[in-house]
Amino acid sequence: MKFIRYFHKILTLILFVLILTQCSEKNSREYVKEGLEHLNNEQYDSARKSFLKAIEKDTNNAEGYYGLGGIYNYEKNFEEAERAFKAVLKIDPTHHNAWYSLGFTYELMGKKDEAEESYKKYRRLKGEIDSLINQEKH
């Protein structure tokens, strides 16, 4: 009987510790928010790490990839920036800012045709969004 009580106490303690560690662990969106805060403070290495953690937590977090793409552009790592922005668009093809950023990346890489194609998609999506916003106002 003592063994069962002891076992029950140990099991309760283990479950309590597991619950506490899960509660204190950040989720993907929180890592993106942290990354943006690092960006605002010009802490680019810390921002990159936060965006990578966001993606590690949720491989479908478009904003994590988007932030990472911005960091890679800042670091002039254009191939990685291109991959990051393409990952955003694979998750959300209507992410107009990712189309713009991909176009900008292509421009920096000297790929003018690809840049223009991305900008064209950005303008189309941005126009649709602006139209919806105008409809909401009226």
State each model region's role.
Residues 2-11:
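Bacterial N-terminal signal peptides that target proteins for export
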Residues 20-22:
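C-terminal motif of bacterial Sec signal peptides marking the signal peptidase cleavage site
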Residues 26-57:
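Alpha-helical segment of the N-proximal tetratricopeptide repeat
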Residues 33, 67, 101, 135-136:
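Canonical tetratricopeptide repeat
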Residues 41-53, 75-87, 109-126:
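Structural signature of tandem alpha-helical TPR/SEL1-like repeats
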